[in-house]
Amino acid sequence: MSTEKINLLDFDRKGMRELFAQELGEKAFRADQVMKWIYHFGVDDFDNMTNINKQLREKLKQKCEIVAPVVSEAQHSSDGTIKWAMRVGDQDVETVYIPEEDRATLCVSSQVGCALECKFCSTAQQGFNRNLKVSEIIGQVWRAAREVGLEKETGRRPITNVVMMGMGEPLLNMKNLIPALEIMLDDLGFGLSKRRVTVSTSGVVSGLDQMTGKIDVALAISLHAPNDKLRSEIMPINDRWDIQDFLASVRRYIASSNANRGKVTVEYVLLDHVNDGTEHAHELAQLMKDTPCKINLIPFNPYPGSPYKKPSNSRIDRFQKTLMQYEHTVTIRKTRGDDIDAACGQLVGDVIDRTKRTAMLKAAKGETIEVKAL
């Protein structure tokens, strides 16, 4: 397939209409028709778009293509979770399907690897190679929807929620993240509710400020420590934007958002005898008193070579109860897919060059910001 062809998965509705007008000489409604075929029916063959005239189909075949990541490996958990390794170029990223009684969530990657070097995250230990294209982000959703299929055919629940919590820091890939989110929300795309699409960030303040007022989705923040000293030890990004800078940016976003209903989800991974003491719980409760939130506790998911351990159930329970004394809403995330290394912090994928982290961060400066070498 010619590399010169235009991948239609790289365009949101506005971009698709512009493409059809400028490159194909076609009206906007034709672009809308093609988007419906791609996202409503999972069609990637122009000949199967039966309400498109033959002349346009031939033009599309000559100039365009519909190419999503392909599944190179699938692992099925005993709890119904599926982890797909999806091939992007000559590398793999990981995408996870998590079915529940009332919904099915897809965890999507935004980068090949991750540059932020959070000490407790398996992905971060693999290095960073590049940002994913729009087609490689939305293509994970497209491919997963095809793999899951219709409920009546496979018995699997269709995807109802998307969380940008896979490999990578989404807000370091703003250029491609925003169009992908637009397609997820668009009625011509996947038509998901803005409350069912969640972006998680480790604290890229400039990226979050760019999102404010631009796109409205649910926000989750990876906090993981109640003070700057500890957070900088386990999350070096805190040396660039400290907790107060981060939370101020969060409050700005929440103030402009309807999707979050005035609250942010705080993610807090519990590391045994590192950040899980009652003193940490008291400190966290005080820290969040001015930021409306719900706190999601995540017991650490071990991976080979990790220096950290999962806390005992008694320590987890004590941490939760301490927070609840302050009338915070506190949940403990149920671990899913840990038998196939698909749980939070376990995604690895296939990263070729572990030396590119700093160079790639500098290259990303033109898209968002420059994070100092961590």
Swiss-Prot record:
**Entry EC number(s):** 2.1.1.192
* Cross-referenced Pfam families: Radical_SAM, RlmN_N
The cofactor(s) it depends on are: [4Fe-4S] cluster
Catalysed reaction per UniProt? adenosine(2503) in 23S rRNA + 2 reduced [2Fe-2S]-[ferredoxin] + 2 S-adenosyl-L-methionine = 2-methyladenosine(2503) in 23S rRNA + 5'-deoxyadenosine + L-methionine + 2 oxidized [2Fe-2S]-[ferredoxin] + S-adenosyl-L-homocysteine; adenosine(37) in tRNA + 2 reduced [2Fe-2S]-[ferredoxin] + 2 S-adenosyl-L-methionine = 2-methyladenosine(37) in tRNA + 5'-deoxyadenosine + L-methionine + 2 oxidized [2Fe-2S]-[ferredoxin] + S-adenosyl-L-homocysteine
Keywords from the UniProt entry: 4Fe-4S, Cytoplasm, Disulfide bond, Iron, Iron-sulfur, Metal-binding, Methyltransferase, rRNA processing, S-adenosyl-L-methionine, Transferase, tRNA processing
Q: Which residues bind [4Fe-4S] cluster?
A: C114, C118, C121
Disulfide topology: C107-C344
What is the uppermost EC class here? transferase
The family database entries (InterPro entries) matched by this protein are listed as: Aldolase_TIM, Methyltransferase_A, RlmN_N, RNA_MTrfase_RlmN, rRNA_lsu_MTrfase_RlmN/Cfr, rSAM
* Protein purpose: Specifically methylates position 2 of adenine 2503 in 23S rRNA and position 2 of adenine 37 in tRNAs. m2A2503 modification seems to play a crucial role in the proofreading step occurring at the peptidyl transferase center and thus would serve to optimize ribosomal fidelity.
Under HAMAP family, the record lists: RNA_methyltr_RlmN (MF_01849)
Q: What else is known?
A: Reaction proceeds by a ping-pong mechanism involving intermediate methylation of a conserved cysteine residue.
**What is this protein's name?**
Dual-specificity RNA methyltransferase RlmN
